[in-house]
Structure formats: C-alpha cells, structure tokens
C-alpha cells in the first residue's frame, strides 16, 4: 500500500491543486456579505431578526420537516432535543461509541449516562442488529411502560444514532426496534444535511434531530445548529427552551422554567441563509468528488466508504479504510508531510476519561474501524 501513497497524493492534488489542502474548508460564494451587511444595518444582530426566522423556514423546506428551530451550535441542539425527549438525570441513553464527543457530552449535561452500542462497518452508524441484541439480553420492560437496564436498574429513555460523515445508517430499522421498547429516537444529523434514506431526508425518522453548521460542515455560519421535528408541541417547546424559557410579554421578564440562551444570532443566520441557497450546488460538487475518489481507490485496491442501497449520502467527509493501524498512521503522516490534511476517525468514546466506565457491548466493528478509517480532503472544489 505504501507504494501507492504518492499516487494518492497526486490524485488529491489533481482534484484540489497545489499548496496546503485542508480537510474541509468553507466556501462563501453567494450572498453572505450582502446578507451580513443587511443584518448589521438593521442593528438586529443577536437572537431576534428576520434571518433567524428565514433560515428556520428554509431549512424546514429543504429537509421536508414541519418545523426547524435554529440554535447556537449542534451540541446545544442535541442537548435540548434530549430534554424534549424526556431524558432526565440518572436515565440512560443508547448511542454509538464511534461518534464525535458532542453526542456523549450532550447526554452528560442532563446527568444521564451513555450506553455504547456497536456500529455497522459499511455505514459506521448504529447497528440495528447490535441494538436488537442489547435489548434482548440486557433490558427488561417494567410495569410503568419503560425499558430498564438489567445491569444498572436505570431507565433507558432515548437512543441517539449518528449518520457518520453524512453516510446514512439503517435508521428505519433502528427506529422500529426502539419503538418496540418505548425508546425515543433523537437523530444526530450533525453531519448529514443533504443525506437521504428512501428519498426521505435524514432527521425525519426519529422524533427529533440535531444539525450542526460548524465551520467545517457542508454549510456553515461559523457556528450554528438546528433542531428539526414534525411534532408541533415539541417544536414550540424547543423554541421556548432555547430562548431562556421567557414567557411572551411586551416588557416583563418572566421565565417559567430553566431555559437556555441557545438561540442562533441573526448574524450567523444571515450567513446560514446564504449558504443554504448554495446547498444544492455544494452537494452536486461533493458527489462528483466522491465518485472520482471511489473510482480511483477501487483501481488501486483501497476501500472507499460509499453510501449503501436506498440511501443518498452528502459525502461531507470522504473516508477510506486501510489495512491496519500501522498503515493508517503511515498514510496520515505521509499526506500531512506533503501538505495534505488527513485525519483518523475519532477515539472511541469509551476510551475517553469521562466515559471510561460506561457500559458497552462488544464494539467489535467500532474497534476495527477506529484503527483503519482515514478522512481525506472533501471541500467544495472551485
């Protein structure tokens, strides 16, 4: 494989040119400056303004969801989604160990505990088979109608599967399994804006979903996140909680519960609106890049992570799977030495100090992927 390292570098440079090549750089080729100037001129630069409302409307239209609530980042969207799902302190939430730390952090903010379930190798997302096995062997339904962990005695309230790198997981199966056990599904769609399963946008399968618009995402507004849902009651409470739980009144300040200052500022929303206008262009461009990568890596015998049947990925971050950790590390060192940014997948959550005592299943696929997956440059190509 090391003999192919120069060829891979040449291919990436063929796509992205000379000089330093980042992993995923933002592209501002639309109305970003115009909308920002308009926002500044309006003086409405904080969490009240026309662009916040417009972005929510346009995001809902794009995803096909009935409601979208803009937040300051993806982690805040996850945090509030879990509260809306009814997760409380001392509950447990099923999720994957192979994820970005925000997923587990959001669970911990509530005082709940993550339980880590394995992923499928082909999607890198939560495995329906492993999830079913966990319910069968490790849980019991109580007379109160809730599912409990036999080992800990704690209530399992929610499940957070993530569409890793924008590759849709087998979400219909996950939702079906969770429904049998009275578990609410919150989709972590931080990376999957523009990804579909059977022509339905990711995020519309669970009761709630959380998006991220961080600087390295398919569209960005510097930070930013959003909750989508098709439940009007959840949507209204999401907006209420993210605006400090303030009761509507022309001048009085009355807050009827503990809320959060999580509303997306109008400045960020102005950029987000301009980015969303270009999303179709971004997705088309990234799909062409992924197809070129897929063809090239197939020719040299390297596994490229592709979407599975009946799904459409946004190919946010393209990924390859190498033979072992040694080959992975050699490749990452070689490419970065040649000014091409590549990176390994995240350290598994159960290896981190904060979650080292969390319950897990065997995580066979997660450990296997952790040692082999490498992300390669995936920016919009001009």
Each predicted region: which residue ranges?
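N-terminal "arm"/small-domain region of PLP-dependent enzymes with the aminotransferase-like
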Residues: 1-45, 377
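Phosphate-binding glycine-rich loop
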Residues: 45-92, 98, 106-108, 116-118, ...
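Structured binding elements
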Residues: 111
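Active-site phosphate-binding strand-loop segment of PLP-dependent enzymes
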Residues: 122-221, 226-228, 233, 375
């Amino acid at each position: 494989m090391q003999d192919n390292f120069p060829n891979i570098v040449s291919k990436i440079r063929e796509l992205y040119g000379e000089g330093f090549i980042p992993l995923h750089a933002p592209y501002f080729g639309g109305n970003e400056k115009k909308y920002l100037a308009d926002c500044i001129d309006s003086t409405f630069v904080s969490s009240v303004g026309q662009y916040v409302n417009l972005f929510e409307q346009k995001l809902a239209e794009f995803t096909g969801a009935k409601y979208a609530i803009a937040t300051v980042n993806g982690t805040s969207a996850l945090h509030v989604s879990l509260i809306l799902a009814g997760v409380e302190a001392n509950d447990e939430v099923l999720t994957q160990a192979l994820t970005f730390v925000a997923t587990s952090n959001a669970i911990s903010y509530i005082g709940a505990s993550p339980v880590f379930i394995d992923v499928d190798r082909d999607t890198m997302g939560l495995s329906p088979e492993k999830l079913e096995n966990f319910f069968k062997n490790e849980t019991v339904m109580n007379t109160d109608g809730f599912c409990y962990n036999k080992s800990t005695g704690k209530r399992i309230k929610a499940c957070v599967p993530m569409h890793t790198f924008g590759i849709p997981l087998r979400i219909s199966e996950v939702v079906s399994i969770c429904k049998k056990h009275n578990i609410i599904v919150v989709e972590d769609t931080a990376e999957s804006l523009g990804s579909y399963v059977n022509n339905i946008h990711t995020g519309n399968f669970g009761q709630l979903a959380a998006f991220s618009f961080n600087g390295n995402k398919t569209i960005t507004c510097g930070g930013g996140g959003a909750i989508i849902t098709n439940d009007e009651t959840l949507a209204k409470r999401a907006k209420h909680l993210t605006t400090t739980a303030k009761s509507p009144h022309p001048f009085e300040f009355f807050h009827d519960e503990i809320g959060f200052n999580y509303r997306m500022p109008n400045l960020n929303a102005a950029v987000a609106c301009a980015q969303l206008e270009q999303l179709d262009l971004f997705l088309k461009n990234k799909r062409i890049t992924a197809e070129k990568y897929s063809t090239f890596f197939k020719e040299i015998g390297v596994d490229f992570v592709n979407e599975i049947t009946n799904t459409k990925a946004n190919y946010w971050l393209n990924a390859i799977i190498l033979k072992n950790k040694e080959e992975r590390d050699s490749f990452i060192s070689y490419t970065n030495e040649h000014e091409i940014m590549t990176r390994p997948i995240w350290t598994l959550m159960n290896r981190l100090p904060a979650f080292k005592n969390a319950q897990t299943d065997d995580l066979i696929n997660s450990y296997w992927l952790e040692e082999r997956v490498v992300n390669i440059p995936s920016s919009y190509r001009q």
